[in-house]
Amino acid sequence: MATLQATNILTGTTEGAKYNATGSTSEIWTVATTTALASGDTISGPVIPANTYLVDVLVSWTDVDSGSGATFECGYTGTLGAFIATGNTTPASGGIVHANVAGALGYTATTNTTVLVTMTGTAGTPVAGTCRIGVIYTASP
């Protein structure tokens, strides 16, 4: 299993949690997938700050599989499919998927939470590409 680290699309670095006391905060992180993604590989993305409320998680893929085997889920340590359900096929064709699991909207935790994208199926015919992970959260629900 490989672990990839996404970086903030604006700064090119990994960053800790941050939020705006009013309104909402949006972040987009990106990672190049130059090698074949296999089932169990994980991409570490943005951090949802403690005591904030999740509005949405978005994951965008270029077509990283000219076959049809690449699937993923999105969540956090201990609950990897908390935001986007296990087996999503977007990496096999490219596109964008939003949070689609009950309880994702309004998710909150008492500690900073790193968003994780985990492959649940291996690419049949791997293609180098890009995965972008976006989060939107607010301090006031």
Please give the residue ranges for each predicted region.
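Surface-exposed, low-hydrophobicity beta-strand/loop segments enriched in small/polar/acidic residues
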Residues: 2-141
